[in-house]
Amino acid sequence: MIKKIFALPVIEQISPVLSRRKLDELDLIVVDHPQVKASFALQGAHLLSWKPAGEEEVLWLSNNTPFKNGVAIRGGVPVCWPWFGPAAQQGLPAHGFARNLPWTLKSHREDADGVALTFELTQSEETKKFWPHDFTLLAHFRVGKTCEIDLESHGEFETTSALHTYFNVGDIAKVSVSGLGDRFIDKVNDAKEDVLTDGIQTFADRTDRVYLNPQDCSVINDEALNRIIAVGHQHHLNVVGWNPGPALSVSMGDMPDDGYKTFVCVETAYASETQKVTKEKPAHLAQSIRVAKR
């Protein structure tokens, strides 16, 4: 899918390294810079791919995901906002509406090291169908040798949220994640609280855990691709570790049957409590990603 994105015809050359393209129904922004290749969908301000020069793709994007208006994209970095997980009210979209609506590219800046982009979503008749509040939501990205994401929300309300990042791995059976802390809510086991005794999360089967006292950096050890991905978290309360495992993967129409084998989600989240946003104090949720050889 990522190769397909970079082979799409250019609709508009925004700058020497930025172009607008289209995949099925969705407008994309493609970054082709000497230090980095990356792509975004305007729907959801969704980072689809990020590949620093000399590295393998860092993010995973499903080859089966549709690029349709209003349909969530499977992979990359979905922005879950203003709620994380199932909606409290029946009939509303899981993980909020921010990932399903078109955003605006507000600004971009390029230098020798990479590209910075800011996307914006504000209240509209469409958002009021889901949520009554006025808001301005900004998604700031800096892509180069590292990837930095900052979700900034303005208004008067409370939210839960996550940067639901899908990381590309060689073989989930040879992946471990450290730095998650010990206490977690096990969403596969009736949301019971449990403890990770050795500090190392592996993914033998379906895993869906909300960690309650994570460190500020999670480390993904990928034995098959012989690399380490360091995931920094800022302004967060939780880190979520997720992989659907074989049975759920087969049931998901936007994922290959064996899709679970080549990704792991390590998510920067504010999920176990609400985050308060006021006019005097906007809220942030931020993630930084670095890659290194093992």
Enumerate the predicted regions with their spans.
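Acidic-aromatic substrate-binding/catalytic surfaces of carbohydrate-active enzymes
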Residues: 34-93
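Extended, loop-rich substrate-binding clefts of extracytoplasmic carbohydrate-active enzymes
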Residues: 92-144
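Beta-strand/loop-rich accessory regions of lumenal/periplasmic or secreted enzymes
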Residues: 70-99, 178-191, 215-218
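Short, hydrophobic/aromatic beta-strand segments
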Residues: 49-51, 156-164
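Short, well-ordered beta-strand segments enriched in hydrophobic/aromatic residues
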Residues: 38-40, 141, 147-155
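Active-site/ligand-binding surface loops and adjacent short beta/alpha elements
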Residues: 158, 166-240
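Short acidic/polar mixed-charge low-complexity motifs
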Residues: 34-37, 46, 55-58, 133-135, ...
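Beta-strand-rich recognition/accessory modules
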Residues: 1-34, 43, 127, 136, ...
